[in-house]
Amino acid sequence: MLEKVFKLKENHTDVKTEILAGITTFMTMAYILAVNPSILSAAGMDQGAVFTATALASLIGTLCMAAFANYPFALAPGMGLNAYFAYTVVIGMGYSWQTALTAVFAEGIIFIILSLTNVREAIFNAIPACLKTAVSVGIGLFIAFLGLQNANIVVGGSTLVQLFSVDAYNQANGVEASFNNVGITVLLAIIGVLITAIMVIKNIKGNILWGILITWILGIICQIAGLYVPNPEIGFYSLLPNFSSGLAIPSLAPVFGKLDFKNVFSLEFVVVVFAFLFVDLFDTLGTLIGVSTKAGMLDKDGKLPRIKGALMADAVATTVGAVLGTSTTTTFVESASGVTEGGRTGLTSLTTAILFGISLFLSPIFLAIPSFATAPALIIVGFYMLSNVAGINFSDYSEGIPCFICIAAMPFCYSISEGISMVVISYVVINVLIGKAKEKKISVLMYVLVILFILKYIFL
């Protein structure tokens, strides 16, 4: 039956290889079950409910990939997109998280429509490759900066940010924490970064997840030894899992179906939706093409067969995920780990999806993982995304300067959408003024985007 459904022989694989590949993929991306609730809780969302939404969205999205495209790719709420959701749309722009979920839902619907037509190719071809790369790099820096903040390695100060000290932390947050509250967690986070980095260099499977778990375990040891002292009143909780409710699945009720359509006709809301769509679209296409190239899945013309099904799985997962109560669900680049293990069909995805289902019953473990343990994951994921900077031709200043503006704007303006706006405007304006617009083959769509972004800055 499995042979008939997944065409294993045709894809030169077998059941054992596919299952092992699915387990490997899950190990490399399971960190999202701890990181996503942590990030979205900063937007005021219930952490337990977001955990359940994250697991379910990952389960459904990955199943869709297996069913629609028969590819070994897994989906989950995307890093960068969740940070944009919480820190830019909600905290920075002042929208409620319910409105932000509505923007994700709208993006998913648009993505479904684009996936049913050839519009996605037109959009993909309209944006220069260097700008797509710059967006990825900028998000990487933004994520790494969030990791440094979540670990309290950097704190607010008279110089906007400064290296951690207990006094600086207390002054920035208006609390009276001690070394045994915050100081030890900073040291543990730094150790976690080093441990994760070593495992990445050694190419250990599941390095990011293992980095989180090891950092957390070291924290538990410190708590038992009295080096870490919980103080819930100022945000430092016990690191031990709370099994008082058994292995019950946290209720979805606080976030399920909480869409708010009041602001959907505002220009700023449209910009937010576009930012979600832009990043999701190019992140998905980049992941699909990059991983499938590594696996030798492209046809003789360099195209990915059944890409429409893969994009549809991504679009459906995003739409369903928004209703469940999580930020944009997208294809994970960590799928490459399963492909490296020999995964070639949807059976790999099915295996990963089943493991996400099992994880629903392990919420006390994932929800007990502190931000200082997940911060190293953010920093290392930031490194992965930053490594794409090699694809930008900085010797061509007409490309390099706009890309630099994008990369710098995202962390320094604390906004992914501002980086996207600035790179599109600067790229078009610079190349028009120096007479390179025709040479660069700037599309009509790019000019339309420039007008929209300029209107945003004038009227918002």
Question: What is the role of each PLM region?
Answer:
Residues M1-A49, V175, I212-I307, I451-L455:
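Helix-loop-helix hairpins and the membrane-proximal interhelical loops
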Residues L2-N36, A57, G78-Y87, I91-I139, ...:
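Helix-loop-helix junctions within the multi-pass membrane cores of secondary transporters/permeases
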Residues H12, K16, I191, V270-F274, ...:
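Alpha-helical membrane-protein architecture signal
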Residues I23-A30, I60-L63, A67, A144, ...:
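Hydrophobic/aromatic residues within the transmembrane alpha-helices of Major Facilitator Superfamily
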Residues S38-A49, T88-T99, S266-V270, P370, ...:
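Helix-coil boundary and interhelical linker segments in multi-pass alpha-helical membrane proteins
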Residues G44-L63:
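Loop-to-helix transition at the N-terminal end of transmembrane alpha-helices
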Residues S58-M79, I110:
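Juxtamembrane transmembrane-helix boundary signature
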Residues M93-I217, L350-L460:
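Membrane-embedded alpha-helical modules
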